[in-house]
Amino acid sequence: MTISEMHYDFKVKLDKVASQTKEDFNVAEIDWLLNEAQDVFIKQRYGLNNPHRTGFEVTQKRIDDLSSLHVKQPEQVGITPTLTSGVYEVPLSSLTHTYLFYTRGSVDVTVTNCPTTTMQLRHIQADDLSDALRDPFNQSSITDGVLFNFGKSSGNLATTSIYIYPGTLTLGDVYIEYIKHPRQMFFGTYTYIDGSTTTLTNCELPEHTHSEMVDQAVLIASGIIEHPTYQ
């Protein structure tokens, strides 16, 4: 659906579930509701808060639902990490698109007298990191993968970096696969609160997800209407 069609679908569905109210949402408010619904939809499909607690790639439908936001190679090129005090850092702000959720990562590893090989990154909880670094059976290795976790970027505390703990390995480029932030839908005809504006922007998620997002927007709107402070 185009953004215009999503607005129409929203109005029709809202009228069915909230027919007792004569209140109406304006264009800017419907845009906001659709974008809020999009955020909820993405988090559910990624696995953060879906009721079945299933992850992103558990079912083909979840993979399809977020396929247009899932960034992989070659769209996302390898990034050369910086090395400080034996730890490699990859600022997520250096990715091609605005990062939202991590899905998978790998890194080029150089071993003496062997050709460069690409190994999977292996996430380690911060609480377990110290023990893992001291444990020879749990450290980064060419058989078990390379340890990493997330933290504040060293160059900008408002952003996040991936920190990689190579052990005795020498690392090259890092390859991150991730869910990017979606474009914000915008119907047009108005100006944002900050004075900015943009051209008409349709939803970039797959077509088959649009009706579900409108349903979610109607659910959010219904909750607003039913709230005692709504006038």
Features from the language model and the residues they span:
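Glycine-enriched, solvent-exposed interface loops adjoining structured elements
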Residues: 1-231
